[in-house]
């Protein structure tokens, strides 16, 4: 039976690797009674290369570090002004399939942007969310022991130039776009507050409990 309470952890700006390892630890040590959590964070500039990633898609990283990680997908960029959301969910307990989870995440972004009269959409062959063929949100998950970690990155108000140093998600010439220039949420906090609402509704959570920072380990 699904626990209808979702714990939201607001992490502020945090180093990518420390949050990644904390996600792994939470997933590896959780049990059937562990709560589902949503981690809201921004990262300093970093490229992350997913398990399907190919080195030729990293064109010119320059001074931005490249980290090989254990999520699905290919290379992407994280940086200040981008909303990153990590759903740490027991999908086995809640009886949500992986494809259904991906669809819910994409739809939550689409629904949130629709509140700003932005017509966004998903693509069956290229996970993420798009507006006029430009990508506004990237998606990469990992499922372990029936539980999800990693998640989504929504471009809000950031420097998009580093995306030109890679082939985003393995697509040469893929153009990125962000919420601010589309007339969407203007800050990461605003985007996070709105996305929490749409995502929790789609996933069936009825009570949200907010926390600042990670739980003491």
Swiss-Prot record:
It is found in: Cytoplasm. Catalyzes the transfer of endogenously produced octanoic acid from octanoyl-acyl-carrier-protein onto the lipoyl domains of lipoate-dependent enzymes. Lipoyl-ACP can also act as a substrate although octanoyl-ACP is likely to be the physiological substrate. Belongs to the LipB family. It catalyses: octanoyl-[ACP] + L-lysyl-[protein] = N(6)-octanoyl-L-lysyl-[protein] + holo-[ACP] + H(+). Substrate binds at residues 71-78, 138-140, 151-153. Signal peptide: none annotated. GO terms for biological process: protein modification process. The record marks 135 as: Lowers pKa of active site Cys. It holds the Pfam family LplA-B_cat. This is Octanoyltransferase. GO terms for cellular component: cytoplasm. InterPro entries: aa-tRNA-synth_II/BPL/LPL, BPL_LPL_catalytic, Octanoyltransferase, Octanoyltransferase_CS. The gene is lipB. Pathway: Protein modification; protein lipoylation via endogenous pathway; protein N(6)-(lipoyl)lysine from octanoyl-[acyl-carrier-protein]: step 1/2.
């Amino acid at each position: 039976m699904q626990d209808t309470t979702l714990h939201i952890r607001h992490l502020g700006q945090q180093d990518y690797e420390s949050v990644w390892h904390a996600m792994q630890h939470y997933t590896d040590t959780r049990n059937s009674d562990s709560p589902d959590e949503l981690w809201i964070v921004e990262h300093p500039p970093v490229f992350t290369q997913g398990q399907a990633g190919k080195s030729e898609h990293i064109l010119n990283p320059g001074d931005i570090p490249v980290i090989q990680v254990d999520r699905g997908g290919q290379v992407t960029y994280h940086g200040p002004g981008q909303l990153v959301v990590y759903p740490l969910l027991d999908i086995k307990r809640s009886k949500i399939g992986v494809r259904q989870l991906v669809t819910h995440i994409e739809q939550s972004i689409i629904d949130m942007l629709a509140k700003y009269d932005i017509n966004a959409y998903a693509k069956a062959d290229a996970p993420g969310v798009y507006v006029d063929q430009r990508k506004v949100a990237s998606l990469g998950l990992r499922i372990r022991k029936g539980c999800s970690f990693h998640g989504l990155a929504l471009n809000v108000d950031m420097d998009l130039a580093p995306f030109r140093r890679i082939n985003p998600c393995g697509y040469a010439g893929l153009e990125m776009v962000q919420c601010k220039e589309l007339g969407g949420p203007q800050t990461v906090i605003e985007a996070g507050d709105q996305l929490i609402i749409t995502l929790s509704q789609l996933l069936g959570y009825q009570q949200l409990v907010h926390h600042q920072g990670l739980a003491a380990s």
